[in-house]
Amino acid sequence: MTQANLSETLFKPRFKHTETSTLVRRFNRGSQPPMQSALDGKNVPHWYRMINRLMWIWRGVDPREILDVQARIVMSDAERTDDDLYDTVIGYRGGNWIYEWAKQAMDWQQKACQEQDAMRSGRYWLHASTLYNIAAYPHLKGDELAEQAQALANRAYEEAAQRLPGSLREMEFAVPGGSPVTAFLHMPKGDGPFPTVLMCGGLDAMQIDYYTLYERYFAPRGIAMLTLDMPSVGFSSKWKLTQDSSLLHQHVLKALPNVPWVDHTRVAAFGFRFGANVAVRLAYLEAPRLKAVACLGPVVHALLSDPQRQSTVPEMYLDVLASRLGMHDASDEALRVELNRYSLKVQGLLGRRCPTPMLSGFWKNDPFSPEEESRLITTSSSDGKLIEIPFNPVYRNFDHALQEITDWINHRLC
């Protein structure tokens, strides 16, 4: 089946699909104060989704393209679940978030198919993949249209990988007690086996969101990157997120001696947001297998255990948490009780001495991850490093932080 035919098959014009903002039915919804963070964007008035401009631009989306798609959504007069929220248009039609971003992606997909130059075609495929992935954002369980967009994002990513520098291998890893999981191994030019970073992404992201991280930071240093979807989404959708949050990554880590392209004696883990929960767990549970663990804006204790901090978090992010935990009908109180069990401090890990070198970067006044969170991680390590990242200029400081973190990882892997 061609890519175009797949698009037509998946997105048949139907209007009965459940609208994204209604998938999680928490009972205590309320208005929240304005909030902004470097890694998550901000909760803009009249939008259900957080608008994550920094990360979308970092992944290669032109700011004007973001505004163009937003404008089409705003201008739609189609029926909405909530008339006060622009991105709640019901059904796959003009004005619907998934429709408009997927339509934008299809334009780039068409350009990719028509482009003769392999490298340029690869760039267009990668861009299409990014846009399909934004269409599927925030990847809530049971969102049929989003899952279809995600399938197209993965397909476009595979097409891009065939044309871009280095090589990418799609790998399947067995996990006892359930379905195998699919990971992507990104390898730089040269002969392996390569030192490798195991990427642990955030709960509202997919494994294909981190190509920029590989291309700009890891590949130039000769480091490979292995990505894996978090439990309950993407290729790991058959696995529920549990208090043993590192389960899937742990099984992949244990299997690396059998992967000929990976130097299993030189492996580090890198965690964004809740991915740091996974990475830090691995630092404790699999210390002999890891040379280092780096975290950025970690979610390992404060947000999971502090009701006051949870009350400042946007509705969409709480919905993401509830969706990942399989608590689609839960009250905020029930969600808080469950989240507390995911705190690595409550689990008795953080605070104990850890032999694995750990770095953690934070932004001051980050609503998701206070300075104390990163400090708790680095002081628990026998070789800890704390990085404060100034907020403005946000893009330049984000780049500087990633360069510093990559240098630190590279030093530990050499």
From Swiss-Prot:
EC number, as in UniProt: 3.1.1.1
Key words of the record: Hydrolase, Serine esterase
Enzyme class: hydrolase
GO molecular function, one term: carboxylesterase activity
Catalytic activity of the protein: a carboxylic ester + H2O = an alcohol + a carboxylate + H(+)
NCBIfam families, A to Z: PRK05077.1 (NF003460)
Biological role stated in the UniProt entry: Catalyzes the hydrolysis of esters.
Family the entry assigns: Belongs to the FrsA family.
Protein name: Esterase FrsA
Taxonomic lineage: Bacteria, Pseudomonadati, Pseudomonadota, Gammaproteobacteria, Enterobacterales
